Curated annotation (Swiss-Prot):
Protein name as annotated: tRNA pseudouridine synthase D
Organism encoding this protein: Chromohalobacter salexigens (strain ATCC BAA-138 / DSM 3043 / CIP 106854 / NCIMB 13768 / 1H11)
Similarity field: Belongs to the pseudouridine synthase TruD family.
Ranges of residues in domain TRUD: 162-308
Transmembrane segments: none
Reactions catalysed, as given in the entry: uridine(13) in tRNA = pseudouridine(13) in tRNA
């Protein structure tokens, strides 16, 4: 029988809990995100790529405003990732403009609606979802956390050991609303037309993944491979199953070369084996309404690393008494997974 969890769930932390209370979004300027790509627009083609900076605006809404300003359909605008609303974010959008230029007043028009065009280049193809390599975060922390004497030491621990790769609260909606809607949808039979963007499916899969990760944390094996683990290779989409853990694998895991993964539940073969498969099956049985609902809806089984490593992390004090942390995370990872290991906040 599926249980209705306390919200937010009390998923465990990895490094001794948060140090002190604080804020990280007092203003949009406190939360800056920039997409990082491994390629650049070629300079010619049917699609005009716009490097934009948006403030206090969701990515879908920004795309709609760009489409309207360019006189094209919303589906003619592409973007790689969904960025936070209460933030300053920089990302590419592509606009299908074959044989014509963008309106002369485009920059001025968008500037009035919270969107600045920082660069514009042509490219032969539309920007597809999920093609950026990582997101670069620059976050300003204020409140008690900024003055805590243990902050630098805790930050160094996160940089060296990594953090649990939890899906963040944004995935579940306010007070877990997306998950509540998923439960209702599965009870009556999920339909794509009622969930066109897949938010309910994503919330259910994310919750189950977080439950598996939490169980591994409670036994302190979220970074350490176990028999039957599906291990992800750092910096690639490759993964493999280990039947027996040896000293070489343990050393590779300590160095961050490989990481255990957890399930993004759906229809298909469960890749894990042995004790790992048994643990995952027990959790899916506990939340059968969600796991079976995902299978019936046709979501495809996938995996996600349990441990999240920070790329080029840095910490500094600013002139106003706050602390600024910066780091890169692979696409699909949440900055809140890092922040919850540092500080207390209602959404963490």
């Amino acid at each position: 029988m599926s249980e209705t969890p306390i919200w937010p769930p009390r998923w465990p932390r990895a490094h001794g809990g948060p140090l002190a209370a604080g804020d990280f979004r007092a203003t949009p300027e406190d939360f800056v995100v920039e997409e990082v790509f491994d390629f650049a627009p070629e300079g010619q083609g049917e699609h005009l790529w716009l490097w934009i900076e948006k403030r206090d605006l969701t990515t879908p809404e920004a795309a709609k405003r760009v489409a309207r300003a360019c006189g094209v359909r919303p589906r003619d605008v592409g973007y790689s990732g969904l960025k936070d609303r209460v933030a300053v974010t920089r990302q590419w959008l592509s606009v299908h403009l074959p044989g014509r230029e963008a309106p002369a007043e485009l920059t001025a028009t968008l500037a009035t609606s919270g969107i600045a065009i920082l660069d514009a280049r042509r490219h032969p193809r539309k920007l597809k979802r999920g093609v950026h390599r990582l997101n670069r975060f620059t976050l300003r922390l204020t409140g008690d956390i900024a003055e805590h004497p243990g902050l630098s030491r805790q930050w160094q621990t996160l940089c060296e050991a990594g953090v649990p790769n939890y899906f963040g609260p944004q995935r579940f909606g306010r007070e877990g609303r997306n998950l509540i809607m998923a439960r209702s949808a599965f009870a009556r039979g999920w339909r794509k037309r009622d969930d066109p963007h897949g938010m309910q499916l994503s919330a259910a899969r994310s919750f189950l993944f977080n439950e598996v990760l939490a169980a591994r944390l409670r036994t302190d094996c979220w970074r350490t491979p176990r028999d039957g683990d599906v291990l992800a290779l750092a910096g690639s989409a490759s993964r493999f199953v280990t039947e027996t853990v040896d000293a070489t694998l343990l050393d590779r895991a300590r160095r961050g070369d490989v990481a255990p993964t957890g399930p993004l539940w759906g229809k298909g073969r469960q890749e894990s084996g042995a004790e790992v498969a048994a643990l995952e099956a027990d959790i899916m049985a506990t939340h059968a309404a969600l796991s079976q609902g995902l299978e019936a809806a046709g979501a495809r089984m996938d995996r996600r690393p349990l441990c999240l490593r920070l790329e080029t992390p840095a910490l500094r004090l600013d002139e106003e008494g706050g602390v600024v942390v910066s780091f890169g995370l692979p696409r699909g990872a949440f900055a809140t997974a890092v922040l919850r290991e540092l500080m207390q906040h209602p959404v963490l």
